[in-house]
Curated annotation (Swiss-Prot):
A GO CC term attached to the entry: cytoplasm
GO biological process, one term: chaperone cofactor-dependent protein refolding
Subunit-level organization: Heptamer of 7 subunits arranged in a ring. Interacts with the chaperonin GroEL.
GO MF term set: ATP binding; metal ion binding; protein folding chaperone; protein-folding chaperone binding; unfolded protein binding
Name of the protein in its database record: Co-chaperonin GroES
Gene encoding the protein: groES
Family: Belongs to the GroES chaperonin family.
Organism of this sequence: Hydrogenobaculum sp. (strain Y04AAS1)
Chain coiled-coil ranges: none
Role summary: Together with the chaperonin GroEL, plays an essential role in assisting protein folding. The GroEL-GroES system forms a nano-cage that allows encapsulation of the non-native substrate proteins and provides a physical environment optimized to promote and accelerate protein folding. GroES binds to the apical surface of the GroEL ring, thereby capping the opening of the GroEL channel.
Length: 96
Protein backbone atom coordinates (compact mmCIF):
# COMPACT_ATOMS: atom_id res chain seq x y z
CA UNK A 1 0.00 0.00 0.00
CA UNK A 2 1.12 3.58 -0.61
CA UNK A 3 0.20 6.92 0.97
CA UNK A 4 -0.55 9.70 -1.51
CA UNK A 5 -1.22 13.00 0.28
CA UNK A 6 -3.65 15.54 -1.14
CA UNK A 7 -3.43 19.33 -1.46
CA UNK A 8 -0.90 20.82 1.01
CA UNK A 9 -0.30 17.62 2.98
CA UNK A 10 3.04 15.80 3.12
CA UNK A 11 4.17 12.40 4.39
CA UNK A 12 7.29 12.38 6.58
CA UNK A 13 9.32 9.48 7.98
CA UNK A 14 11.05 10.36 11.25
CA UNK A 15 14.83 10.05 11.24
CA UNK A 16 16.04 7.30 13.55
CA UNK A 17 18.01 8.40 16.59
CA UNK A 18 21.12 6.63 17.75
CA UNK A 19 21.07 4.81 21.08
CA UNK A 20 21.42 7.31 23.91
CA UNK A 21 23.47 6.89 27.08
CA UNK A 22 23.80 9.10 30.12
CA UNK A 23 27.30 10.30 31.10
CA UNK A 24 27.40 7.51 33.68
CA UNK A 25 26.73 4.87 30.99
CA UNK A 26 23.02 4.15 31.56
CA UNK A 27 21.20 3.37 28.31
CA UNK A 28 17.98 5.36 27.89
CA UNK A 29 15.17 3.12 26.54
CA UNK A 30 13.14 4.20 23.50
CA UNK A 31 10.02 4.60 25.64
CA UNK A 32 11.70 7.30 27.76
CA UNK A 33 13.04 9.34 24.84
CA UNK A 34 11.28 12.15 23.03
CA UNK A 35 10.58 11.39 19.40
CA UNK A 36 12.89 13.12 16.94
CA UNK A 37 11.57 16.28 15.31
CA UNK A 38 13.50 15.73 12.10
CA UNK A 39 12.36 13.60 9.21
CA UNK A 40 12.59 12.90 5.50
CA UNK A 41 9.75 13.88 3.17
CA UNK A 42 8.45 10.69 1.52
CA UNK A 43 5.52 12.13 -0.49
CA UNK A 44 3.93 15.53 -1.17
CA UNK A 45 0.47 16.65 -2.25
CA UNK A 46 -0.21 18.60 -5.44
CA UNK A 47 -0.21 22.03 -3.76
CA UNK A 48 -2.02 24.50 -1.55
CA UNK A 49 -5.33 25.87 -2.82
CA UNK A 50 -5.29 29.66 -2.54
CA UNK A 51 -8.33 31.88 -1.91
CA UNK A 52 -8.58 32.70 -5.63
CA UNK A 53 -8.71 28.98 -6.51
CA UNK A 54 -5.18 28.72 -7.87
CA UNK A 55 -2.92 25.92 -6.68
CA UNK A 56 0.50 26.95 -5.33
CA UNK A 57 3.17 24.21 -5.53
CA UNK A 58 4.64 23.17 -2.19
CA UNK A 59 8.03 24.46 -1.01
CA UNK A 60 9.13 21.01 0.19
CA UNK A 61 10.05 18.15 -2.11
CA UNK A 62 10.40 14.40 -1.78
CA UNK A 63 13.77 13.66 -0.19
CA UNK A 64 14.02 16.94 1.76
CA UNK A 65 15.12 16.67 5.40
CA UNK A 66 12.73 18.79 7.48
CA UNK A 67 12.39 20.09 11.03
CA UNK A 68 8.92 20.14 12.59
CA UNK A 69 7.14 20.78 15.89
CA UNK A 70 6.95 17.75 18.21
CA UNK A 71 3.14 17.85 18.07
CA UNK A 72 2.98 18.15 14.27
CA UNK A 73 1.00 15.81 12.09
CA UNK A 74 -0.89 12.58 12.57
CA UNK A 75 1.05 9.36 13.03
CA UNK A 76 0.00 6.47 10.78
CA UNK A 77 1.40 2.97 10.40
CA UNK A 78 1.61 1.34 6.99
CA UNK A 79 3.25 -2.02 6.25
CA UNK A 80 4.96 -1.97 9.66
CA UNK A 81 6.50 1.50 9.13
CA UNK A 82 5.43 4.65 11.01
CA UNK A 83 4.89 7.90 9.14
CA UNK A 84 3.60 11.39 9.91
CA UNK A 85 1.01 13.05 7.69
CA UNK A 86 1.10 16.81 8.19
CA UNK A 87 0.29 20.09 6.49
CA UNK A 88 3.19 21.86 4.81
CA UNK A 89 2.79 24.82 7.19
CA UNK A 90 3.70 22.52 10.13
CA UNK A 91 7.24 22.30 8.72
CA UNK A 92 9.51 24.78 10.51
CA UNK A 93 12.53 24.50 8.21
CA UNK A 94 14.23 22.50 5.48
CA UNK A 95 17.63 21.21 6.63
CA UNK A 96 20.32 21.53 3.96
Amino acid sequence: MKLKPIYDKIVVKRMEEKEQKTPSGIIIPDTAKEKPQVGEVIAVGNGKVLNNGEIRPLAVNVGDKVLFNKYAGTEVELDGEKYLVMAEDEVLAIIE
